[in-house]
């Protein structure tokens, strides 16, 4: 029985299946953890969702910002952008079934035995684990309810960007969503910066990657996350695992086998078109 953690798939179905074959993943015996952003940019979002859903209890995933955006498009709140390549999924006969399943997935995964926590963007240093659990449940409850379109309509925005237990209503839900799915940099006090996307070396002072600011969760748990492809899986402290290595941008899809901490990679089927900054099929 092995536990495999894989970074952002982004619709790269062929690479996902090739990587799972490489590690000899066996549903029913092994467990697959996915860092979110299952969909968008790659050509196979529909196949990815169908496959992941079919795994049942053999998969543990978290929602990413692109997954939430897909739900907003499905609900008629956001525009379907051609570059996201979501039309085959949105027009599929089982779209309702797939997307209603997707919106009932969590923002946070925890394995107490492994001392392992996973969230798409990471865990803000302003939270302890109990707060993270409560915050995840708040958003998950709304997403799984009939009123989820109202939340999706209000989730876009960068404020508030500082945690307080006194936050209420949509502002609270927006902060939680941003912390779990969009966070990269923080100010030294843990306040979120929602604008900088460059590498840590190029970020303006006093910003730091969230994982460079001491927080109570990282003191006791390993943290696995995706979202930040430009890290290329590097530069994190011990016990912090960056797994998004930019498959949809022409990089690789990365898998970490938890038991022996061995990495496996599957090269993207796409290459970078530097003139456009987009990855194209090779």
Swiss-Prot record:
**Highest taxon, organism lineage:** Bacteria
Checking InterPro entries in the record gives:
ApaH, Calcineurin-like_PHP_ApaH, Metallo-depent_PP-like
Q: Which reaction does it catalyse?
A: P(1),P(4)-bis(5'-adenosyl) tetraphosphate + H2O = 2 ADP + 2 H(+)
Task: Quote one Gene Ontology molecular function term.
Answer: bis(5'-nucleosyl)-tetraphosphatase (symmetrical) activity
Q: Which CDD domains match?
A: MPP_ApaH
Keyword S-adenosyl-L-methionine in record? no
Q: Which UniProt keywords apply?
A: Hydrolase
Asked whether the UniProt record includes NAD among its keywords, one would answer: no
Give EC number(s), comma-separated: 3.6.1.41
Entry-linked HAMAP family: ApaH (MF_00199)
Query: What's this protein's family per the entry?
Result: Belongs to the Ap4A hydrolase family.
Q: What does this protein do?
A: Hydrolyzes diadenosine 5',5'''-P1,P4-tetraphosphate to yield ADP.
- Give the matching NCBIfam families: apaH, PRK00166.1
Can you name this protein? Bis(5'-nucleosyl)-tetraphosphatase, symmetrical
Name of the gene encoding the protein in the UniProt record? apaH
């Amino acid at each position: 029985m092995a536990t495999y953690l894989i970074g952002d798939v982004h619709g790269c179905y062929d690479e996902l299946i090739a990587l799972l074959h490489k590690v000899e993943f066996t549903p029913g015996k092994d467990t697959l953890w996915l860092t979110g952003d299952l969909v968008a940019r790659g050509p196979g979002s529909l196949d990815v969702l169908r496959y992941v859903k079919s795994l049942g209890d053999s998969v543990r995933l978290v929602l990413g910002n692109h997954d939430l955006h897909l739900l907003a498009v499905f609900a008629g709140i956001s525009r379907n952008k051609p570059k996201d390549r979501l039309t085959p999924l949105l027009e599929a006969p089982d779209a309702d079934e797939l997307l209603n399943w997707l919106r009932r997935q969590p923002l946070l995964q925890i394995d107490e035995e492994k001392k392992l926590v996973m969230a798409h963007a990471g865990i803000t240093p302003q939270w302890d684990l109990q707060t993270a659990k409560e915050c995840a449940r708040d958003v998950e409850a709304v997403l799984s309810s009939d009123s989820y379109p109202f939340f999706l309509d209000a989730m876009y925005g960068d404020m508030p960007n500082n945690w307080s237990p006194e936050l209420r209503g949509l502002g609270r839900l927006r902060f939680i969503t941003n912390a779990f799915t969009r966070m990269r940099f923080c100010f030294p006090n843990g306040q979120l910066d929602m604008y900088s996307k460059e590498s840590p070396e190029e970020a303006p002072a006093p910003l730091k990657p969230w994982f460079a600011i001491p927080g109570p969760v990282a003191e006791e748990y390993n943290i696995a996350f995706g979202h930040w492809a430009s890290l290329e899986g590097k530069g994190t402290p011990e016990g912090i695992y960056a797994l998004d290595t930019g498959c949809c941008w022409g990089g690789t899809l990365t898998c970490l086998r938890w038991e022996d901490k061995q990495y496996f990679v599957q090269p993207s089927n796409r290459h970078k078109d530097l003139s456009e900054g987009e990855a194209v099929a090779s």
